[in-house]
Amino acid sequence: YTGMIISTRESKATREKVIRLGVSQISGASKTSVGGYGSPAPEEENSAQFDVSDNRTLDEVVCWLMELGFIPSFCTACYREGRTGDRFMALCKSGRIGDCCHPNALMTLKEYLEDYASEQARRTGSALIRRELGNIPNERIRHIATERLEKIATGQRDFRF
């Protein structure tokens, strides 16, 4: 019940190899310097903690993951719902974590597609979401997720299981 994280320090090729081994978190468009998400610092003031090898945009990483058959997820629901520690482990051990993770991944991807994505990402992601909805085994959860995805398309946000 552990996860592996791979950062943008690694090349695209390395990231593609290891993601198939079970990497559960992957960075995209990371900034490693102080204030890096604000205005870029002049080169002489560069305070980067490490060099980035994968310089693709977040949209490029999201498209790449979808093309590889993965569902990019921006989910923070467990943390926000207090499902940490023993509560989280109980869901994992019972096998019920998928009742949360799968629909939450689809909903957070939908929010990204609506708010930030390129047209290519929207097309690819919309098709992926349609396919993946059918893979939610619990009919009740699938129905609720479908309703929430429709609400996201109308501008509502922040749904979670």
Named regions from a protein language model:
Residues 2-6, 26-28:
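Hydrophobic faces of well-ordered beta-strands that scaffold small-molecule active sites
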Residues 16, 21, 30-161:
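Radical SAM enzyme core and accessory elements
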Residues 7-11, 31:
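Active-site beta-loop-alpha junctions enriched in small/polar residues
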Residues 13-14, 25:
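Charged, low-complexity C-terminal accessory regions
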